[in-house]
Amino acid sequence: LMLTVCDEAMVRSVEKACVQEAKECCVHLKIDSGMSRIGARTELEAQQVLQTLQACPHVRLTGAFTHFADADGQTEEFTRQQFERFQQLTAALSSDIVRHVANSASIHRYPEMHLNMVRMGISMYGYPPVASELPLKPCMSWKTEVTYVKKIAAGDTVSYGRTFCAG
C-alpha cells in the first residue's frame, strides 16, 4: 500500500509520524481533477503541497494520481477533461514518479490512459463498472461511514457519474 497526500497538512502529519518512528515514507499525491473529493484541485494547491514535500526530508513523492468521476458514463467528454487536467497539474513533476488515473471503467474503455499503472477497483470485487460490458458477479458488500467533508463551489459535480451538482 502507498500513502496518499492531498494537502500540506497531510504531508506535515506524515513527516511528523516518520520523525517519531525514525522512518522514511513514500507517498502519492492525489489530484482532484473533477471528482470533488480529496486532492489538490488547482495548480497553486499542487505547488503548495510540492513545496511542503520538499521541506519534509522523511517523505518522498513517488507517484501522482486522480480518480475519474464518470469513466463509465454515456459520454467521454468529462473523463477526457479530467485526464487533460491531471496531465497539466502533473506536467512539472519528475518523470520518475508513477502516474495513475485508470479505474475499473477506464481500464476497459480508455487504454490510452493507463499511464504507468492502473487501479483495478470495483471490478476486482465482482462489480462491473458497466454491467453490459463485463460478465462479473459480486463477491462481497461494503459498509462505511463519513470520514471527510470537503467544501466545493456552486456548479462543481461530485462522485461517480457526477451524481450531485452543488447549487
Model-derived features: where do they sit?
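Catalytic beta/alpha-barrel core
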Residues: L1-V11
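Active-site loop/helix belt of alpha/beta enzymes
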Residues: A9-C26, D32-D156
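Short, intrinsically disordered, charge-balanced linker/junction segments flanking boundaries
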Residues: V158-G167
